[in-house]
């Protein structure tokens, strides 16, 4: 699908893709699911699952660079600060005809509004972390995260 998600679609993803529980083992499964998706599609990405103020999973595929880690940090910080996916923040600012990184209160060295980072939320609890992918065009980074979360949440609900 090449068309952009609407802001409502992106908010719907955030509302729908929440965990009943999340722990270190869940983070590991999520990271491994992302790695498998990347390998199955022969894509080169860096992956991070960050929760409870620590990195619980980090993997950089052969062929990625330090720059991917810098993008991961900036995307993660955006989600932690604003509570929405980095893709939503970018699309929201695009709809407002403004550049996120050029706003006075934003340091572009610390934050970016490019897709690939998504909030990890526990139902009835709130934001506990961020899952991030870097290495593809932003919509594809975002979609990879959505696909992994969808698969993992479905499998957790069945067990």
Swiss-Prot record:
InterPro entries membership: PduO/GlcC-like, PduO/GlcC-like_sf, YBR137W-like
Q: Mind telling me which Gene3D superfamilies this protein's record contains?
A: Haem-degrading domain
Q: Which SUPFAM superfamilies match?
A: GlcG-like
Listed disulfide bonds for this chain?
Answer: none
Which family is this sequence assigned to?
Belongs to the UPF0303 family.
NCBIfam families xref list:
PRK02487.1-5 (NF002696)
In Swiss-Prot or TrEMBL terms, this protein is called: UPF0303 protein Ping_1243
């Amino acid at each position: 699908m090449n068309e952009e998600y609407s802001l409502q679609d992106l908010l719907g993803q955030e509302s729908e893709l929440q965990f009943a529980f999340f722990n270190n083992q869940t983070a590991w499964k999520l990271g491994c699911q992302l790695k498998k998706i990347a390998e199955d599609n022969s894509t080169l990405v860096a992956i991070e699952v960050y929760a409870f103020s620590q990195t619980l999973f980090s993997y950089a595929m052969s062929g990625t660079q330090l720059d991917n880690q810098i993008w991961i940090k900036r995307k993660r910080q955006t989600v932690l600060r604003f509570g929405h996916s980095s893709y939503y923040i970018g699309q929201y600012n695009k709809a407002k005809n403004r550049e996120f990184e050029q706003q006075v209160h934003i340091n572009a060295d610390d934050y970016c509004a490019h897709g690939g980072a998504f909030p990890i939320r526990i139902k009835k609890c709130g934001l506990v972390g961020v899952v991030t992918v870097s290495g593809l065009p932003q919509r594809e980074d975002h979609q990879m995260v959505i696909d992994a979360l969808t698969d993992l949440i479905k499998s957790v609900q069945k067990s």
